[in-house]
Amino acid sequence: MELVFLGTGAGVPSRGRNVTSIALSMLNERNTIWLFDCGEATQHQIMRSQIKLSKLEKIFITHMHGDHIFGLPGLLSSRSFQGGDSNLTIYGPAGIAEYVETSLRLSGTRLTYKINFEEIEPGLIFEDEMFLVTADDLDHGVRSFGYRIVEKDKQGALNAEKLKADGVEAGPVFQKLKNGEIVTLADGRVIDGKNYIGEPQKGKIISIFGDTKETANELELALNADILVHEATFEGDKAKMAGEYMHSTTLQAANLAKTANVKKLILTHISSRYDRDASKELLIEAKTIFENTEIAYDLAVFPIGE
């Protein structure tokens, strides 16, 4: 898995940063892409990346501000033109279905696939055999969600060396043993696959927040995450301004990462007042509190768990 930052700016696009969108690439895990927010020109950013719209399975919208949703109609239309025909699910606050459907209807856009809308409330919003996703309210004036994506633990690897030491040669029997089955070998021995499977591989946790000021709900969403993606619209000494505008500072994000025991913090949603050099200063001050911090730039790619 990896995170691809398609847009990392706040409010309006700038020369250095487009508005918000983040792709969670899970090509190795489930051959799909999940998208978190879709600001204006997100599809242009996708053309500059390795992402293919045909792989897009789900879109998660954090809130209904324009810099997080204005890219949806064009992206959905282009997906159709490019041959995307698999169903797509869009999760988000109340109003997301009306916004998308109205935009497509008034523009006369017909899609080659079905969109399923899930207008969410806090709690579990998706689960299958591989992942579960929960959402909770943040604090941004309008309803804004944070998402917690949990990869379920994976079965441990089959210990081929141990099998070889016990005189079991590689072959079709390995698949049955990997499934934990009890197998009778050609020589009459009966062995239990569970005795040859290693410890389960712990799944990853990714927390991706929408716009927010400091709020108690953040802690549970971020707790023990492998990666926390948090807005940092303002520098640390502008906490009062950040609160008034319902946003966060670098230091507030770093303090949350430290308290929540996350492994890596990635700062995004950077105000256009900070050019690339000033953004480096934002990173430096966040690192004074939480060392394993990165600041995202457009088209930056972060492998999960590295």
From Swiss-Prot:
Zn(2+) 2 binds at D67, H68, D211, H269. Its EC number is 3.1.26.11. This is Ribonuclease Z. Zn(2+) 1 binds at H63, H65, H140, D211. Homodimer. It is an enzyme of class 3 (hydrolase). It catalyses: Endonucleolytic cleavage of RNA, removing extra 3' nucleotides from tRNA precursor, generating 3' termini of tRNAs. A 3'-hydroxy group is left at the tRNA terminus and a 5'-phosphoryl group is left at the trailer molecule. The active site is at D67 (proton acceptor). InterPro entries: Metallo-B-lactamas (IPR001279), RibonucZ/Hydroxyglut_hydro (IPR036866), RNase_Z/BN (IPR013471). Keywords: Endonuclease, Hydrolase, Metal-binding, Nuclease, tRNA processing, Zinc. The gene is rnz. Zinc phosphodiesterase, which displays some tRNA 3'-processing endonuclease activity. Probably involved in tRNA maturation, by removing a 3'-trailer from precursor tRNA. It comes from the Bacteria. GO terms for molecular function: 3'-tRNA processing endoribonuclease activity; zinc ion binding. Gene3D superfamilies: Ribonuclease Z/Hydroxyacylglutathione hydrolase-like. Binds 2 Zn(2+) ions. Belongs to the RNase Z family. Its cofactor is Zn(2+).
